[in-house]
From Swiss-Prot:
Keywords: Cytoplasm, Ribonucleoprotein, Ribosomal protein
Name by which UniProt lists this protein: Small ribosomal subunit protein eS10
InterPro entries, sorted: Plectin_eS10_N, Ribosomal_eS10, WH-like_DNA-bd_sf
Pfam families listed in its UniProt record: S10_plectin (PF03501)
Gene expressing this chain: RPS10
Taxonomic source organism: Lumbricus rubellus
Length: 156
């Protein structure tokens, strides 16, 4: 598709910076959500990169998802004249602050490990479950009929 080089460079710069790109499948949308170019230009430029094997494409619920491959990183680096030190955001490690977790206070009384669960576990002095199972001590059993239509009248 014929598009200006300015639009193509804007699309490639955004893709290289983020590493991923999302576009709604709407060819008549005047502007893309993140880039200031027509949505059709974004879809066609990415379709071109997919056909060359530089980008992996997923489609779900009327949205295209494109992921930059290693060959695509090298191609865009050459196209945009970028140094090798600059990498997409998907390849950068995220730093997690260690102080984000709240630490328990040292002076707070704490239960010993397993004390709160001891009531649920079987102990040595626990009840005998197998001995308690069964019909019980009463051996005077009564067998009665069913209820409703299946029950027969007893004659006296």
């Amino acid at each position: 598709m014929l598009m200006s080089k300015k639009n193509r460079v804007m699309i490639y710069e955004y893709l290289f910076k983020e590493g991923v790109l999302v576009a709604k499948k709407d060819f008549h949308l005047p502007k893309h959500g993140e880039i200031d170019v027509p949505n059709l230009h974004v879809i066609r430029a990415m379709q071109s990169l997919v056909s060359r094997g530089y980008v992996k494409e997923q489609f779900c619920w009327r949205h295209y998802y494109w992921y930059l491959q290693n060959e695509g990183i090298q191609y865009l680096r050459d196209f945009l004249h970028l140094p090798p030190e600059i990498v997409p955001a998907t390849l950068k490690r995220q730093t997690r602050p260690e102080a984000a977790r709240p630490r328990p206070k040292e002076g707070a009384p704490r239960a010993q490990v397993g004390e709160d669960r001891a009531g649920y576990r079987r102990g040595f002095g626990g009840s005998d479950k197998k001995g308690e199972a069964g019909a019980g001590a009463d051996t005077n059993f009564q067998f009665r009929g069913g209820f409703g239509r299946g029950r027969q009248e007893q004659e006296e």
